[in-house]
Amino acid sequence: MGRYSRESDNVAKSCKARGPNLRVHFKNTHETAQAIKRMPLRRAQRYLKAVIDQKECVPFRRFNGGVGRCAQAKQWKTTQGRWPKKSAEFLLQLLRNAEANADCKGLDADRLVVHHIQVNRAQCLRRRTYRAHGRINPYMSSPCHVEVILTEKEELVSKATDDEPAKKKLSKKKLQRQKEKMLRSE
């Protein structure tokens, strides 16, 4: 079992999943993970399926050099976005794994929220491509490690309301006038 970079506050109400050395682009996966952070589990799954179908885009905020603009990015208050299909598929699979772990622990899947998701660079894999005049150039891939922690959302307790509304504070002058009116009416 690998070490996670962060531990949950309430271990009994959370579940984990991780994927080491995934053959998927680090930069695309990082942006996709940032988009689903703090989302409810069901919404995150719907969102990733929509990204695969190109119904919603992933906003590119950090690794956005050369990324084109798209209208769907407006809902994220940015202009640049893409639809990284492979990253979305990998993260969707990881969320399914975490959901299965939650089910095994007896947690309610409808109340789960993506509490923590982190994407780290893995060791680059080296291949080669052959160029003109007998030269050879590297053909590198940038895999990544992904870890996710889902936490059950706690019920918010609403503030108790008093039966009587709070009385207005009155100045001494107004209290005096009210007393005078009461005396006159009697």
UniProtKB/Swiss-Prot annotation:
One of its GO terms (biological process) is cytoplasmic translation. It comes from the Eukaryota. PROSITE patterns: RIBOSOMAL_L22. Transmembrane segments: none annotated. The keyword Ribosomal protein applies. Residues 159-186 are annotated as: Disordered. InterPro entries: Ribosomal_uL22, Ribosomal_uL22_CS, Ribosomal_uL22_euk/arc, Ribosomal_uL22_sf. The modification Phosphothreonine is found at T161. This is Large ribosomal subunit protein uL22. It comes from Drosophila melanogaster. The lineage of its organism: Eukaryota, Metazoa, Ecdysozoa, Arthropoda, Hexapoda. The gene is RpL17.
